[in-house]
């Protein structure tokens, strides 16, 4: 039996994902992720659960940078979940009061902000870098949705 290709064209998918979000809201999605990361790390002080955490934003005409200390992305989450579009694990974080709901905020923000992104994550003793650039966007081949860590 033959098969028909039914995967989305990447450019179409990205345009649909970002068409209804303003740039400021995309940045707020990234800050939501910082808040969720701090929640996952756990409060150091129950009365002030975000004490000691920060998210610094740097914006220039040619670049946007957010630097935080909110826990990073665990490698297994990056490999299997964080860069997927939408939640695959509905019960993940069910016991936490996280802000994120749909699993698209970071990706939508990255695509809204521009065509070149370098994401560096440090979680516990592990760290990795992910690059999403024009070459990745233009690759609609069978492995086109994969990202190198």
At which residue positions do the language-model features occur?
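Short beta-strand/loop element within the Bergerat-fold HATPase_c
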Residues: 49-61
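Short helix/loop capping segments that flank catalytic or ligand/cofactor-binding pockets
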Residues: 39, 74-76, 122, 128
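GHKL-type ATPase core
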Residues: 93-149
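Glycine-rich/acidic phosphate-handling loop/turn and adjacent ATP-lid/helix
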Residues: 64-95, 137
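Conserved, well-folded catalytic cores of nucleic-acid-processing
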Residues: 20, 33-37, 85-89, 112, ...
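Bergerat-fold GHKL ATPase/HATPase_c domain
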Residues: 1-52, 76-79, 83
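Glycine-rich, histidine-containing beta strand-loop boundary motifs that form or position
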Residues: 30, 68-70, 77, 120-123
